Amino acid sequence: MRKSFLKRGSTLVAVLCGIALNPFAAGTASAQEVKNATLYGNMSTVTQDMLSRAGGDANNFLHTNGNYAQTRYYPASQINTSNVKNLRPAWIFQTEITESQETTPIVVNGVMYITTSFNHVYALNAATGQQIWHYKHKMGPITTYCCGPNNRGVAVAGDKLFFGTLDAKLVALDAKS
């Protein structure tokens, strides 16, 4: 039972991300929150000040677990104790990977970034789940992994995404492409 649950992880993780992090999931996003989800427009550079204040930013989710303190707190006001029971999946995104998922997504300017097992990174429209781009790191001749072929997610700074690979590389990607 547990194994089959993990095999469906790629879909489940994305659905839960869509519910938990999507500022549009409750269907009551404020006009300001919609306006700030720029997606394909001028993506603001993520500064150290933005990273330091991430816990109070209702438009972005810039850290694994939300902030440097790892609180998992999201300050948006449209989801509250009276309407949380009404949340429904906003979208489902199916990755091409069927292994377990152990990633935490981040959201920057309306774009959700997720990683999967075997060094894949996806950029998704956080409002719709539509894929914007996909990157797959080519690995060397590695045959064993500690603890499975998992990836824990990306970090963001400036206009770059950073992630560690199974073959001990640190990769920097342009967040827009």
Language-model segments: which ranges?
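Bacterial N-terminal signal peptides
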Residues: 10-23
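Short loop/turn segments that connect beta-strands within beta-propeller blades
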Residues: 126-128, 175-177
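Boundary at the C-terminal end of the N-terminal hydrophobic targeting segment
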Residues: 25, 29-31
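Aromatic (tryptophan-biased) beta-strands that constitute blades/sheets of beta-rich domains
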Residues: 32-95, 130-143
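Extracytoplasmic beta-rich repeat domains
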Residues: 93-106, 134-155
